[in-house]
């Protein structure tokens, strides 16, 4: 069952102060998503980051495109406060606004690049969110999105039990591609990435999951005990326990006027598998 937006915002509010300490996966996924811009002859004038969290990727986007207007949006007041406090001399370099990724408070066709690193995973209406990203893009604008895939934390699903991350949207790569085309994007190029993290013990793993809003109650006693028992099977030679993260990501262009733009409730499109480019890497 999807997590209601208000509950997600409150969850991120609670962990805002310690988020950056537990966001190693998010940071690596963001780095890989930005790499999709390498080699492109593309100079956006206006950039939106959906789910800007602590603002670090707004800074990275501004550094990459210093002449562009950069706007960071997040639904969590706590996260926005952290982003503002960490902005420092960047204050005049990028803007921060509060809003829902499925109902963007922005005009049609006002952005050249929309960037969303893992943030759409927490939106209960992902197809509507993708349609919103399409709406605010100008023709020939680019969207870069990444989400957690269905095999994220696969080795821990049994131990997590009712505390599982099942309330988060976990599309496979084909589903993400189909959703992008239904939203009106042209010929998405998709990747599946795998990230492995290592933790000193069960408590360290749960602390990272809680500190990145993937578990609402990482301190639950029965959860700690279940993860401790499972960790014996997942310990490497150095004595650390591992976790696997699947990241599905895409880049896609907004078509020129005259080509159809479809909302989540619009016309169904059948997509031949050979029309969706998929790459896999570790």
Which residues are covered by each model-predicted region?
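Conserved alpha-helix/loop element of class I SAM-dependent methyltransferases that forms part
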Residues: 24-45, 60
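A short SAM/SAH-binding and catalytic strip from SAM-dependent methyltransferases
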Residues: 112-125
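N-terminal, positively charged/glycine-rich alpha-helical extensions of SAM-dependent methyltransferases
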Residues: 1-18, 277, 282
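A short acidic, Gly/Pro-enriched loop at the edge of an enzyme's catalytic core
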Residues: 102-113
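Class I SAM-dependent methyltransferase SAM/SAH-binding core
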Residues: 46-104
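A short glycine-rich, Lys/Arg-flanked "PGG" loop and its adjoining helix->strand segment in the class I
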Residues: 127-139
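Conserved Class I S-adenosyl-L-methionine
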Residues: 189-282
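Conserved catalytic/acceptor-binding region of the Class I
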Residues: 140-202, 212-225
